[in-house]
């Protein structure tokens, strides 16, 4: 890894001398500068229009969020777009999240009136509970249909969320077949797709949508860390250093175990990134 020779501080660039040590630089010099970060390609605007057009035909909405960043991975526009519809939040990737924090978030979302399901879409855990959870969420509506003689009426659920949160993978697991295209990168799903789960349940897979501007730069960083934003619009080294700083502060033991490195007091994110790179043979 090549050490950067300049650092942007308050609109100016400071040259780093060959003998300077990063830890001795002012704190603001080491700060990640991603103010104004956004990624909102044209297809996301089309997706918002499609959601608005289709929502009236839906019985319920399932919002997939990343269990590692539950609040940051919730698009603030979704509440308005889906107003009035029964809602379920699926906390995906719980296998990669802090279990204690996941429980707190699940309880918080339930307190807000959402049905909540914890899942690991890639491994399949939790996905087998989805169909029953949807029917429980809609039990009053289904009972009303039954009274009108509409037994067996198809339930239609819109599945939405930010890019690369695992929507298509989740749908494929629920449907028990690979119907929706899924890859570990944002922006793969570009159009809506209906996926039947059983004789009376259909899911509408939708492209991931962000919002035009992140007012909170911390939210932007978290979305970048978890792959919701395309790498080619990011400064990957800056973000990696910031993430290492965060992990050292909150999950030092996990960092040590994952990369088999020493995490010492005073280590900067750059130091830790360099240690990890050397440990894995990427640096000489």
Predicted feature locations:
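Residue-level signature of catalytic and energy-coupling elements of molecular machines
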Residues: 66, 109, 170, 205-206
